[in-house]
Amino acid sequence: MVLITVLANLLILQLSYAQKSSELVIGGDECNINEHRFLVALYDVWSGDFLCGGTLINKEYVLTAAHCETRNMYIYLGMHNKNVQFDDEQRRYPKKKYFFRCSNNFTRWDKDIMLIRLNRPVRNSEHIAPLSLPSSPPSVGSVCRVMGWGTITSPNETLPDVPRCANINLLNYTVCRGVFPRLPARSRTLCAGVLQGGIDTCKRDSGGPLICNGQLQGVVFWGPKPCAQPRKPALYTKVFNHLDWIQSIIAGNTTVTCPP
């Protein structure tokens, strides 16, 4: 009975979201130069390698994925084209990194989130501004925006100079669990993608934003390989479920009470 329900959900969602395919560009398009002022790039200090994306949420904090952690990193803000520098680009280093350690009612799938306090505040500018945290959870069926400098081919890796942007659909979590049975029955992650395939986040997009209704609703977490397969959406850490933790740390309370 459960399998029938999941298959029915997949069919209904595939048919309903097919109607929205005209809103999407296969594989994503180059982001508009003014639409990603909050998008940051994480680099390894020693190798200079691009690691992950992240999101500026205020002048002093960046939100990204915990699996993007490396001992020595720097954060680049205001970048569009890796080979063309803007006058207002800024570089910062982590002053402190915070990881979500709560265990009550949270599985390992729910904890891929890292809050970075920058070594000094960022100045808002033409190409730098924070993105709002969510005021409410996103609704299934929402069309959301993803972006990043991650690979644009899979399984072989091709990294672009300019970030790519695409629209994907927020799906019911049961869709992801139907495709990936090892997922827990309940999760505080978001399931999102395009069931027809061809559009997806991929390697090195990790840590970047899932934006729904102009708010940061998700952090790029995990997806199948190769990327962008039909009927195989990806998982995003649900920011709304970590909101109290984030806001408490920003307010100076680093011994945060875990949410229920």
UniProtKB/Swiss-Prot annotation:
Residue ranges listed under propeptide: 19-24
One of the record's GO cellular component terms: secretory granule
Glycosylation sites: 105, 156, 172, 253
Ranges where the Peptidase S1 domain occurs: 25-251
Signal peptide: 1-18
Function: Thrombin-like snake venom serine protease.
Record's protein name: Thrombin-like enzyme 1
BP terms from Gene Ontology: proteolysis
Key words, A-Z: Blood coagulation cascade activating toxin, Disulfide bond, Glycoprotein, Hemostasis impairing toxin, Hydrolase, Protease, Secreted, Serine protease, Signal, Toxin, Zymogen
